[in-house]
């Protein structure tokens, strides 16, 4: 970073401090991961200089031949990776991918069914504070109070009553496998489109570790970071008959020029995701999540739905008598980064919460396995059981640093 040190030492110092934080923190935020140096190199390339409004072969500006090559590589690799008929790699984020999907297929005021945010859904699936909840009539569905899992017969009942134009399946905090086939059958019964948002599980789906929605959903959206371990961005996959509407909704519908440096980085990430190493990595994510969840249960914690099938888990803190906000703040001071999270039927507000969400993608990227997950679960337990004791916090912080040093992050960055 010698050039940045010279041009902007303040920003250079902030970046170095963030690198140090990532290296010496157990990152358990389920939505975060560590992308490869190759992806970061592509994202910092000269393609950031180029405007490329439009699509390959049909650009508004001249000089886009190599932009076309890069975007076609990204599209073709994503198609192959997921088995999709059509792919748009231009969305700047997952929320913009969802917006484009809605704009391509719905009218303002149409009815959408989406998973309740409090039960594990996402803001862009119809939350009243989000554009999706303001533009469309949203009927939420949730998990069973008894099992804390999706009850597809209950979802069918809701669909029959409201007759939505679209059903959105997918979540940001749901620890179980989603039955996309069942959701397709529900959508077919009421004549609705089915959209699957796989932002959290895209890497698992790409590797065959989680069932794919591609055979069942009309539209599939995702982010390219999280388990997919690419740059921050979005992707839309759809059936060929929706391709033109989707592409027009992205550009010129909601975006102008695409971020070609990010699209180049997406192409790199898709190539990495086609390797046997990536599949082994995804399998390890799931094994690690199971090991961490099992140890937390052994240590006396209650988990939403009793465990996990994927990369994340939700820990209920009601019987501990503490809030998610208190837990995540104290854990961060001990070097463990996760997030407070609503649990199903949570009596507290989203800014306080009764739970925490824990994910294993980032620590798995560092090379940690089941033994380390059990160690991490014990560290979390120690902090939560003795939150008011500064000596405990400092002791855990020291052990977290030692664990991180055993699995170094980005040694090539100096």
From Swiss-Prot:
**Primary location group:** cytoplasm
Pathway(s) annotated for this protein in UniProt:
One-carbon metabolism; tetrahydrofolate interconversion; Amino-acid biosynthesis; glycine biosynthesis; glycine from L-serine: step 1/1
Record's subcellular location:
Cytoplasm
According to the UniProt record, list the residues that bear N6-(pyridoxal phosphate)lysine.
226
Binding-site residues for (6S)-5,6,7,8-tetrahydrofolate, renumbered to this chain: 117, 121-123, 241, 349-351
- Provide this UniProt record's keywords sorted from A to Z: Amino-acid biosynthesis, Cytoplasm, One-carbon metabolism, Pyridoxal phosphate, Transferase
**CDD domains recorded for this chain?**
SHMT
Q: Mind telling me which PANTHER family this protein's record contains?
A: SERINE HYDROXYMETHYLTRANSFERASE, SERINE HYDROXYMETHYLTRANSFERASE 1
Its name, as the record gives it, is: Serine hydroxymethyltransferase
Organismal lineage: Archaea, Methanobacteriati, Methanobacteriota, Stenosarchaea group, Methanomicrobia
């Amino acid at each position: 970073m010698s050039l940045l040190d010279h041009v902007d030492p303040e920003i250079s110092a902030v970046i170095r401090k963030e690198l140090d934080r990532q290296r010496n923190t157990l990152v358990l935020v389920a939505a975060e991961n560590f992308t490869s140096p190759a992806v970061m190199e592509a994202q910092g390339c000269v393609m950031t200089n180029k405007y490329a409004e439009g699509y390959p072969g049909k650009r508004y500006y001249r000089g886009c031949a190599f932009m076309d090559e890069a975007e076609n590589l990204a599209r073709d690799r994503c198609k192959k990776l997921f088995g999709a008929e059509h792919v748009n790699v231009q969305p700047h984020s997952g929320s913009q991918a969802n917006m484009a999907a809605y704009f391509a297929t719905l009218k303002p005021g149409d009815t959408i069914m989406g998973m309740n945010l409090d039960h594990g859904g996402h803001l862009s699936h119809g939350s009243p504070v989000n554009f999706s909840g303001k533009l469309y009539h949203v009927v939420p569905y949730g998990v069973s109070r008894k099992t804390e899992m999706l009850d597809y017969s209950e979802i069918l009942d809701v669909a029959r009553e409201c007759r939505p134009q679209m059903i959105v399946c997918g979540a940001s905090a749901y620890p179980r496998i989603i039955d996309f086939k069942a959701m397709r059958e529900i959508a077919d019964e009421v004549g609705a489109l089915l959209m699957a948002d796989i932002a959290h599980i895209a890497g698992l789906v790409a590797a065959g570790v989680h069932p794919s929605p591609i055979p069942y959903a009309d539209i599939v959206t995702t982010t390219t970071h999280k388990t997919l371990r690419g740059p921050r961005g979005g992707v839309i996959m759809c059936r060929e008959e929706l391709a033109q509407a989707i592409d027009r909704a992205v550009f010129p519908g909601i975006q102008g020029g695409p971020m070609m440096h990010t699209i180049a980085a997406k192409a790199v990430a898709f190539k990495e995701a086609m390797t046997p190493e990536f599949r082994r990595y995804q399998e390890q994510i799931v094994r690690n999540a199971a090991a961490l969840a099992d140890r937390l249960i052994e240590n006396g914690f209650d988990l939403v739905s009793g465990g996990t099938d994927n990369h994340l888990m939700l820990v209920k803190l009601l019987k501990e008598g503490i809030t998610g906000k208190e837990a995540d703040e104290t854990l961060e001071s001990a070097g463990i980064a996760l997030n407070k999270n609503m649990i199903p039927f949570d009596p507290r507000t989203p800014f306080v919460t009764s739970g925490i969400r824990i994910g294993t993608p980032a620590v798995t990227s560092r090379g940690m396995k089941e033994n380390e997950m059990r160690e991490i679960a014990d560290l979390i337990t120690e902090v939560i059981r003795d939150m008011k004791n500064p000596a405990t916090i400092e002791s855990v912080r020291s052990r977290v640093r030692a664990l991180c040093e055993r699995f170094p992050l980005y040694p090539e960055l100096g």
